[in-house]
């Protein structure tokens, strides 16, 4: 494994976490405004689900060291 691979994986994990956090927060806001009378718990729930999904994806990326974005990488 080269030195740049973990850096790329961390960058991908952080970008994925920001996207999923923002999406979860946005969906929580929509549900909060439309169904739950402006309560705060849908925001926290949506954000938590997004972060949990991002954590799971990052964990999977770091557990499979020879798989990089769907391509098998041969060790030299």
From Swiss-Prot:
The modification N-acetylserine is found at residue 2. This is MICOS complex subunit Mic10. Its main location: mitochondrion. Component of the mitochondrial contact site and cristae organizing system (MICOS) complex, composed of at least MICOS10/MIC10, CHCHD3/MIC19, CHCHD6/MIC25, APOOL/MIC27, IMMT/MIC60, APOO/MIC23/MIC26 and MICOS13/MIC13. This complex was also known under the names MINOS or MitOS complex. The MICOS complex associates with mitochondrial outer membrane proteins SAMM50, MTX1 and MTX2 (together described as components of the mitochondrial outer membrane sorting assembly machinery (SAM) complex) and DNAJC11, mitochondrial inner membrane protein TMEM11 and with HSPA9. It comes from Rattus norvegicus (Rat). The gene is Micos10. The chain crosses the membrane at residues 17-36. It is found in: Mitochondrion inner membrane. Keywords: Acetylation, Membrane, Mitochondrion, Mitochondrion inner membrane, Transmembrane, Transmembrane helix. It holds the Pfam family DUF543. Component of the MICOS complex, a large protein complex of the mitochondrial inner membrane that plays crucial roles in the maintenance of crista junctions, inner membrane architecture, and formation of contact sites to the outer membrane. It comes from the Eukaryota. Disulfide bonds: none annotated. PANTHER family: MICOS COMPLEX SUBUNIT MIC10. Residues 37-76 are mitochondrial intermembrane. One of its GO terms (cellular component) is mitochondrion.
């Amino acid at each position: 494994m080269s030195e740049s691979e973990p850096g790329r994986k961390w960058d991908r994990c952080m970008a994925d976490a920001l996207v999923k956090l923002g999406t979860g927060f946005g969906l929580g806001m929509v549900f909060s405004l439309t169904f739950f009378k402006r309560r705060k718990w849908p925001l926290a729930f949506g954000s938590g689900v997004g972060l949990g999904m991002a954590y799971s994806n990052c964990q999977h990326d770091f557990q499979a060291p020879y798989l990089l974005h769907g391509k098998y990488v041969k060790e030299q």
